[in-house]
């Protein structure tokens, strides 16, 4: 299922590229004119268990949780469709249980590939608790064409790629672009074989990320195999 593949992508990036992903998403948010409540802390201390063992939610898993250096917690939750009241109440109850378990402030960031104009952004849990995540990042709000052009220029000029460049190559197909996502993925895979200045960690993350994005957006098996072969990093 597409949702499961997108979910796996976000969780994997959160686990193996945590601080870079966190900083990248914060940088995306700053590109808009919207005013957001600042996060109390932006430095990750360690990964926290995603499993909640409680009488109400025994064995249920959150997508990803970080313990921050100020002892607060960042909770990532990903949804592939338009956000619904059910999505928000589900996430809000996770936060309530996580706060009960840790006794610490919980700040939730929802990442959505849905339509921001057709999504709910707050909900009531019960009759007295209004729930609004501190961040809802709708990837479709952010323009991707210029980002792709910028990374392409760096690759063609044999420039060293940053962590943000690597994440751009993975996330651009989910952003707002003038062409469809399948065409964007194919173009990106054509570029990456030309990359030479890249670290071992970046190579692993990019290879893994493109493996999933090609599977998400390319439906024809023969085309998928061809594109994956084309995207082999040197």
Regions inferred by a protein language model and the residue ranges of each:
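Elongated, amphipathic alpha-helical interaction scaffolds
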Residues: 1-234
């Amino acid at each position: 299922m597409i949702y499961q593949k997108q979910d796996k992508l976000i969780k994997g990036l959160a686990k193996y590229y945590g601080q870079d992903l966190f900083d990248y998403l914060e940088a995306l948010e700053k590109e808009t004119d919207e005013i957001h409540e600042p996060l109390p802390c932006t430095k990750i201390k360690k990964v926290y268990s995603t499993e909640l063992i409680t009488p109400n939610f025994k064995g249920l898993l959150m997508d990803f949780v970080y313990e921050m250096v100020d002892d607060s917690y960042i909770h990532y939750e990903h949804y592939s469709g338009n956000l619904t009241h059910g999505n928000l109440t589900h996430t809000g109850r996770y936060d309530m249980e996580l706060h009960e378990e840790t006794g610490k402030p919980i700040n939730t960031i929802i990442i959505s590939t849905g339509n921001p104009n057709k999504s709910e952004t707050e909900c009531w849990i019960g009759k007295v608790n209004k729930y609004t995540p501190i961040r809802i990042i709708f990837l479709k709000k952010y323009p991707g064409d210029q980002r792709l052009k910028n990374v392409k220029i760096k690759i063609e000029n044999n420039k060293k790629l940053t962590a943000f460049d690597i994440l751009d190559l993975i996330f651009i197909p989910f952003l707002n672009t003038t062409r469809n996502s399948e065409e964007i993925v194919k173009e990106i895979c054509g570029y990456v074989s030309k990359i030479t200045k890249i670290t071992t960690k970046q190579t692993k993350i990019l290879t893994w990320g493109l493996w999933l994005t090609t599977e998400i957006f390319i439906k024809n098996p023969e085309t998928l195999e061809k594109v994956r072969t084309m995207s082999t990093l040197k």
